Amino acid sequence: TIRTQVRAQRAFLGRAVRYLTRDAGIRQYLDIGTGIPSAGNVHDVAQEVAPQSRVLYVDNDPIVLAHARALMAGTAEGPVAFIQADLREPEAILSDPAVAGTLDLAQPVGLVLIGVMHHLRDDDDPRRIVATLVDALAPGSYLVLSQSTPDFDPDAMRALAAASEQGGIPNVPRSLADTEPFFAGLELVEPGLVPMATWRPDPDAEQDPRSVYAYGGVARKP
């Protein structure tokens, strides 16, 4: 179900951001495609480890941003900011004054693209979009990315995608081979680009990894 996929995305986000904050020393995040706030947002996870962590949230939905502004607050030492912008226009995101006001792009950043890549059609040139964002970041930055896929259960994924498209929301699942290029030039962190639920799973994880129709990976910019 869609709920299963969303819950799995949120769990992957938590594991990845915890790893980056605790083990990789990342203290600032750019989260694009934020979605409606719920428990375990990027700043919740990061600031639990390092209260000074700064987060800039980006979403193209004004309703999402209204909710986010109302519900998501940073700490005194770790500001949180929000901008309305479209992932398909990465240059506009990077040039927004809120980026310079919240993040120091001369220092490593965690770029979070979870549950958003499938909204990009191939003619949006998603590889260029990711590359443009990564190119703007300092060496030592990280990309956290998920991508829905038909590889595990083609029929179920087709049904989910059709339901999404019917509601006017693009949903483009991609194979492993079509997802790998998003990480071009980056160093994948173990265990690599894998079924999302199997990326450093929590010890008590009971979910069948193949019931989550997505790949997930974390990679470092050298």
Stretches found by the model and what they are:
Residues 87-88, 93, 97-127, 133:
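A short SAM/SAH-binding and catalytic strip from SAM-dependent methyltransferases
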Residues 37, 41-88:
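Class I SAM-dependent methyltransferase SAM/SAH-binding core
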Residues 116-119, 148-152:
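Short "lid" loop at the C-terminus of a central beta-strand within the Rossmann-like core
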Residues 1-28, 32:
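Class I SAM-dependent methyltransferase Rossmann-like catalytic core
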Residues 153-168:
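Short, glycine-/aromatic-enriched active-site segment of Class I SAM-dependent methyltransferases
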Residues 83, 109-113, 129-130, 136-148:
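Conserved beta-strand signature within the Rossmann-like core of class I S-adenosyl-L-methionine
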Residues 169-193:
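Short alpha-helix
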